[in-house]
Amino acid sequence: MVSWMICRLVVLVFGMLCPAYASYKAVKTKNIREYVRWMMYWIVFALFMAAEIITDIFISWFPFYYEIKMAFVLWLLSPYTKGASLLYRKFVHPSLSRHEKEIDAYIVQAKERSYETVLSFGKRGLNIAASAAVQAATKSQGALAGRLRSFSMQDLRAIPDAPAPAYHDPLYLEDQVPHQRPPIGYRAGGLQDSDTEDECWSDTEAVPRAPARPREKPLIRSQSLRVVKRKPPVREGTSRSLKVRTRKKTVPSDMDS
């Protein structure tokens, strides 16, 4: 893991950033020699990046694989070894010059076929989307028609013909409260100066209810335990004879002196 991180850092800094800045300096100074040198480097480095994708998949387990890759990048970039120029002159340029016409023909065919393939794939995609939309629409219409057919006339007649519920506005509740209907036989005009109560009631008269008896207060516990003694009734026409007790005074006898 550590070797992989170091390898990626070396490839990024010494394989891309430094050559990119050197190419900028060559274009700015219009030095043809440096310009050709860095063009050869970028061609070789592009081939290296293409081969790296395959080698990372199959031979990344090889011992010292990342160390070898770092050394190869430094060898390509070094001005002393001039590895990029050497590989280009020995291998890349001769092979490209031999197969240049074939490569150009393949590129032209790829452009034409790519345009045709894009159009064909676009048409197929539109056809598939249109057929899917039509199938979805037909399925939904069939389900709706089956749902409507399931309702028979008896089911429709069985629906109660109830009136719509009245809406009560909370701001005007007093106007919407229904007034009490007068009792049967009562004249709508009410009592007047010349009318009496018997005239206001045409046929029947309300029977007055007996006044409710007041509920007796419950006895307190102390009162309920008391025994009320009642005096016997006094009969009329009788009188008691009152005996008057007289005290006899003892007269002291005169003592003979």
Curated annotation (Swiss-Prot):
InterPro entries named in the record: TB2_DP1_HVA22
Membrane topology: Multi-pass membrane protein
Encoding gene per record: REEP4
Residues covered by region (Disordered): 178-257
Major site of localization recorded for this protein: endoplasmic reticulum
Main function: Microtubule-binding protein required to ensure proper cell division and nuclear envelope reassembly by sequestering the endoplasmic reticulum away from chromosomes during mitosis. Probably acts by clearing the endoplasmic reticulum membrane from metaphase chromosomes.
Family named by the database record: Belongs to the DP1 family.
Name under which the protein is recorded: Receptor expression-enhancing protein 4
PANTHER family xrefs: HVA22-LIKE PROTEINS (PTHR12300), RECEPTOR EXPRESSION-ENHANCING PROTEIN 4 (PTHR12300:SF36)
Residue list for modification Phosphothreonine: T196, T250
Alphabetized UniProt keyword annotations: Cell cycle, Cell division, Endoplasmic reticulum, Membrane, Microtubule, Mitosis, Phosphoprotein, Transmembrane, Transmembrane helix
GO cellular component, one term: endoplasmic reticulum membrane
Subcellular location: Endoplasmic reticulum membrane
Taxonomy, superkingdom: Eukaryota
Transmembrane segments: 1-21, 42-62
Keyword Transmembrane: yes
GO biological process: cell division; endoplasmic reticulum tubular network organization; mitotic nuclear membrane reassembly; nuclear envelope organization
Organism: Pongo abelii
